[in-house]
Amino acid sequence: MISYSRDPKEEIPASAVKILGLGGAGSNMLERIALDSIDGAQLISLNTDIRTLSASLSKSKIQLGLNLTKGLGTGGDPELGQQAILEAEAEVRAALKDQKIIFLCVGLGGGTGSGAAPILARIAREEGAFVIVFATMPFLFEGSRRREQAETALNQLAVLSNALVTFDNNRMGELVLAKQGIHEAFGAADKMISESIKAVIRLVVKPGLIHVGLDELITALRTTRSRCLFGSGIADGKDRAAKALRNALSSPLLDQGALLKDAQSVLVHLSGGESLTLFEIELLMQNLQKHVPEHTQILFGAAIDASMGDDLSITLISSLPEEALAS
């Protein structure tokens, strides 16, 4: 079943969207986002390490644990990360006040990310924001302690956030060619997260031909203790609809599309220039229905964006309970 709405619902201003980069890995993700120039959304870097914080491209910065860590890191200790953000809680709350959507980018396993991320998500929810977390998991070679700390934080974030998107660094090889270096691999992962955030902002902030609002996003992600599935693809030229869908389904965040087989609802958003045709929309949706169960509810939206030129993009968002992901 495909649901859509053309009702002129309240538009979310870009000024009511903030993107947070927490800790070292979160700051790296934020750098990619800053380079990609996401219009309107404010970037905030949060860290205990003053050197990393000072080097951040974001205009807004919050130093955590000013008196606790004296400008140093947490040494991989999540308890220090917890104490550090609690020390800065008043400043954090003030920065998140009256926001509609908060994106939290964080690498789990270390002290600041694993310790502070759940508390930061809780504070953002308490301030009334819809919280979407993009979290990366450590490599296996980083050791069992970091992995356990990451899993603990991830389980907490599954409860405290509205949507949780995870990327395991062990799958980084899927993003680049075998001979490319580690720098290119990390860059590709950060780029994927940046594109994901841009797609969600495009989906709920910009007015659409067929509107998708925050309520539809909540419907697609309503399962508690769930992980968000996300895929975004863009293409141009001949057969661009089929190519864009293939690119979205090939995302590691969708496990090459395999995870959609258990989805109960999927939010689909198309965006293209003035050349976007009804035939392309119908073709793309027919192809998508081959990848989801017959009973799946499809929430559909579309927008005309003249700045896209000949490009067509598709965003797929869904969620699965943790037990389905583990099976």
Each language-model region and where it sits:
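Tubulin/FtsZ superfamily GTPase core signature
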Residues: 1-327
